[in-house]
Structures are given as C-alpha cells and as structure tokens.
Amino acid sequence: MFDFSIVTTAIDSLLRQTLGLGDFWSILIECVLVGVGILTAYALIAIALIFMERKVCAYFQCRLGPMRVGPWGIFQVFADVLKMLIKEIFVVDRADKMLYYIAPFLVIIASVGTFSFLPWNMGAHILDFNVGLFLITAISSIGVLGVFLAGWGSNNKYSVVSAMRGAVQMISYEMSLGLCLISAVVLTGTMQVSGIVEAQVGPWSWLIIKGHVPAILAFLVFLVAGNAEANRGPFDLAEAESELTAGYHTEYSGMGFGFYYLAEYLNLFVISGIASTVFLGGWAPLNIGVEGFDNLMNLIPGFIWFFGKTFAVEWILMWVRWTFPRLRIDQILTLEWKYLMPLSLIILVLMTVCVALGFHG
C-alpha cells in the first residue's frame, strides 16, 4: 500500500536541499500548504455532503431533489454558496457584538481541529499525537461554547433556549462518546490515532471484528452519541424549526450562518471518520487471511478505503435523520443518562475483561 509520507518527505527535501531554504522558511511554507489543503478539503467535503444529503433526503421522500442547476443538480450547492457569500452580514440590535462574532469561529475551530486528526491514508495525517483521541474529544468540546455563545450573544429568547438545549445535549452525550473511545483504547493499547489504525492491519483485525460483541455495541453507541453530539436528527432539538425558528443561529446571516451550516456537515464527516478509523480500520484494507483476496484488497489505495467507509457511515446517519421523528428534550436526556451511559460503562468493563483474559483477536 502506498505510504503518503514519501510525498511529504519529498516536499521537505525539495524545500531544504534543492531550493536551499532554511528551517524557518521551510516550515512556514509547509504550514501554508497544509493550511490551504485543510481549507480546500473542508470546502469540498462540505459541498459533497450537502449535495449527498439533498439526494438522500429526496430518495427517502420519493422525489428527485435538486435537478435544475447543472446535470443532476450538481451545481446547486455552488449556487447556494455564491448566494450566501454575497448576503449582507449584520448584527441585531442590542446583541453582544463580541460574542456574536466570536461564536461562529469557535464552531469552525472545533470542526477543523478534530478534522485534522483523521488519518486518510498510510502516512497521511496532519496532526498525530500519542494522546490523539483525548485531544479530539477536548477540541470538539470547543463547539459547545460556539453554540452557547451564539444563542446568548444574539439577544433573542428563542436562540437562548436553543443554545441551552444544544449545550446540555452535547455535554451529556460526550460521556458515552468518550467511554466508547476508551473501549477502543483498552483493546488497542494506544490513544494515538495512527497507532489505532495500524493495530487493525491484518486478517480480521478491524476492531468491530476483533473486539467481538463489546466492540459492536461500542460502535453502535458511538454512532448514536455522535449523531446527538453533532445536533443531527432525530437529536436536532436545538434547531427545531417548529419551536425555535432556526435555533441558536436564527439571527445570523451571510457567512455567519454559513459557518454553522458548514460546521454541521464537517462534524458529520468527523463523527463518521472517527467511527470508521477507530472501529472499521480507517485506511486499513479488509484482509481475511486468503492470500489472493488480501493481495487484491491491498492494491486499493488507503484513502479510498477511508472515504468509502466514512461515506457509508454518513449514509447510515442520513438515513436515521430522514426516518425517525425528532425527540423531546426529556427523551434525549433520558436516553443518555438512563440507557447509553450505563451501557457504555458495561461495554468498557466487558472490553477490559476480554483483553485481560485474552479473548480478543
């Protein structure tokens, strides 16, 4: 399988040896290239997911979705982006301007920060620390501040109610989310994201297979908790149109609203990417111990495996959104604290016992 670190090493060698640049300028140029790459990937993935969700929604509602702008409506998203870019950005009367302007950037920082930890190919990861999973959960928590400050700074009672709902929901479901990730850490013995993927290379080595029933349950709980963490249906109580207009970003227009819209879909990608990385092997191919089959699977590039698994998980989450009705706030919190939280603790105990007794792999 192709190792992307060859490309990064070649770029570094080009800057330092061929062009003769010093350490400062080499690192600066590399950081600029990485930043441009992140923003480009951010925009393209968000556009692809918006188009995908419109088509998935249309499929479940027995219609065609956008078909006018471009073939099969593929340019509809670009038209919407253009419209959003030229809209005026204004602040409502008596709003807290500092909080109002800071909030969208906090949401973007949280989504881009967690996105940077995803390894999409062997040797292709922007950030890779030995406590990677811990940092992912820590950085994602910044999004709670962005949601709450947006509602509080807008000087709108509906936005405040929405922000409080969203903050309570996101903080609650972080517990189950973290416990499911700890179960994976117990099984692999590392919190480094690249190390977790490397532990799943080999025949029948994906955690959802190697971890048996506890890993399968952890994967399912992670999907439910991740869906709630991203404020996606049926957990989209913070944006309940029939109750709160548009939720915590009611008073935002132009790219202020656009930041929240983009962050929602990138958070969906991050949740799906973490699920595929931790439980489904990430860029690791499916190997079953048959030489011919394994060699064929190894020919498929790692980024295709990663994006294929990630978009498959996203399709499942979109399916859930457009199938189930919205839950009430008491039902959402009851689901977490009475069912998912105890189940996550039981899964962690079972996983620990399986690893201690050698019943894994």
Go through each PLM region and give its residues.
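Selective transmembrane helix interface/packing segments
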Residues: 2-361
